[in-house]
């Protein structure tokens, strides 16, 4: 909601020209319609950039190679998108000669930290304006009132009592009735995944093919990076895969409840982990698990543009060099069962591992 009212507020309170930036990272909305909305709200110019492929290859695939999962459940869908968005915002700010950048992140939350650490990494000289830390608006209801007073078009998502975020990798929901830890999400709450009880009664099988640690095809057919996530989102969502209801530790030393849908990401992460179990030796695999926790914390905290992340990426790139092969998964009502594991680089040897062989050692 905050991003919908920032433009008129900035013009009123700073008397400045406002240039809007829309980063398409696969969010579930018609991005092209945002240009007209921003111009009606008072923006002098609107940049709409399709960053989906860069998001996948430059952000999601390094994340996948790391094996990072925050607090055992969160696949970092929101966290991983923020650095790329902020980087593009800074590039446009410099290109257009801006002297400040602004974001619509709440004053209590992780995203403000992620954006601002990225801003600092690329343009520490630019002033950062965070309206939620300045204005008198203190709730979504008050933000909606401001929007109506200024004749700003609001969407169904704006009017929702929940805060939500989406991109190719996931959807997230916070706030509203979810703040009550005894309350279950409404039945019609989820957008990308079917309720497992209502999903197909028969099993679905999918084979994910990998090269150098990243998925390159399904069932033996090569598929481009963006499409492979879209296809797996559809397959996983239809089978009720990828829901997480998590109470997580935030940057501000508070706990927050988040509900996430990551159908395609869950399938890809599961398959990648299975391939690693075949290919990596024990010492490397165990060390990687430790570093994956560090990587998850780094991404969550907004340190994407840091020497540490670059160093860790070099390690994970090395460990993924031989992650090649195919994993077949069976999907049934929210469950994933591994049906087949194949890799030309597998360290598994049935002749050594079988009980019969061990009896002769």
List the model feature ranges, each with a label.
Residues 2-361:
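Nucleotide-activated chemistry modules centered on ATP-dependent adenylation/adenylyltransferase
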């Amino acid at each position: 909601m905050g991003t919908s009212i920032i433009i008129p507020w900035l013009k009123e309170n700073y008397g400045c020209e406002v240039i809007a930036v829309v980063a398409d990272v696969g969010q579930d909305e018609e991005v092209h319609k945002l240009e007209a909305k921003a111009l009606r709200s008072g923006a002098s110019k609107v940049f709409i950039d399709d960053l989906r492929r860069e998001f996948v290859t430059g952000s999601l695939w390094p994340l996948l190679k790391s094996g990072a999962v925050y607090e055992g459940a969160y696949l970092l869908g929101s966290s991983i998108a923020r650095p790329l968005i902020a980087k593009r915002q800074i590039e446009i700010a410099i290109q257009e000669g801006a002297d400040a950048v602004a974001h619509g992140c709440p004053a209590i939350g992780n995203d403000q930290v992620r954006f601002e650490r990225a801003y600092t990494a690329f343009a520490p000289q630019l002033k950062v304006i965070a309206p939620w830390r300045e204005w008198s608006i203190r709730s979504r209801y008050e933000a909606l009132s401001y929007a109506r007073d200024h004749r700003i078009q609001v969407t169904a998502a704006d009017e929702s009592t929940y805060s939500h975020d989406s991109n190719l990798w996931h959807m997230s929901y916070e706030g509203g009735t979810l703040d009550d830890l005894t309350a279950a999400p409404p039945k019609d709450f989820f957008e990308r995944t079917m309720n497992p009880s209502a999903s197909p009664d028969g099993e679905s099988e999918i084979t994910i093919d990998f090269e150098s640690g990243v998925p390159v095809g399904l069932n033996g057919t090569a598929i481009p990076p963006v499409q492979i996530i879209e296809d797996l989102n559809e397959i996983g969502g239809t089978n009720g895969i990828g829901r997480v209801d998590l109470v997580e530790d935030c940057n501000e030393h508070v706990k927050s409840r988040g509900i996430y849908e990551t159908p395609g990401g869950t399938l890809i992460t599961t398959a990648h982990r299975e391939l690693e179990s075949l290919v990596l030796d024990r010492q490397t695999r165990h060390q990687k698990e430790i570093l994956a926790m560090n990587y998850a914390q780094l991404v969550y905290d907004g340190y994407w543009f840091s020497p540490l992340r670059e160093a860790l990426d070099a390690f994970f790139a090395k460990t993924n060099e031989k992650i090649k092969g195919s994993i077949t998964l069976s999907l049934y009502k929210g469950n994933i069962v591994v049906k087949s594991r194949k890799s030309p680089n597998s360290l598994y040897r049935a002749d050594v591992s079988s009980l019969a062989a061990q009896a002769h050692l």
